[in-house]
C-alpha cells in the first residue's frame, strides 16, 4: 500500500514532516464555534508561509496547491458553526494524482493516519464528481493533508465541472446529468461539454 504513495514521491515520513501542529490548544475534532475566528485565520496564514518555505514541496513531481486565505474564509463561512475544524480545513495542503483505477487507492485506508473519502461512484448528494480523496492526519492537533486521486477519464470531466459548473453554483443535478451524458459518450471533449451544458440548463428534452 505504501507503493501508492511512493509512486508520486510521497512517503509517511514526508507527510509527517509536512503536517502542521495547531498551536490553538484545541482538538481539531471540535466544531468551528469552539475556535476564535481571528486566531484560526492567523494560524492558517502562518501555515501558508510555512508551506511556501518548505523546499521539498518544490522537488515533488506532483501537482499540489496551498489553499489561499480567501478560499479558507469562504469555506469557514459555509460550514460555521457546526462542522469539525479538521474537516473544514482538511485541504490547506492538497496534492492531485492520476491513477489507473481506484482499487489500489482504497487500500490506503489500512494506514492508521489516513482516512479515505470514496467518491468513485459519486458523493452522497451527487454532483457528477468522481474520485477518491485520502486525508493524512498525524493527530487530532495536526491539520490534515489531502491527496486527490482521479483516473484520467474522471479527471477530464472533473476539470470541466470545475471550470463551467462549480463556480456558477448551479444545482448539483446539472453536474449529475452531464456526467450521465459523459458516461453515455454524448460528451467526448470540452466543446461537447459546453454544448451539452447549454441544453441541460435550458432543459432541452430533445438532446
Segments from the language model and where they lie:
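Short low-complexity stretches enriched in small and charged residues
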Residues: 12-18, 46-57, 98-107, 191-193
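Surface-exposed, low-hydrophobicity interaction/linker segments
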Residues: 35-80
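An acidic, glycine-/histidine-flanked metal-binding catalytic module
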Residues: 1-46, 148-207
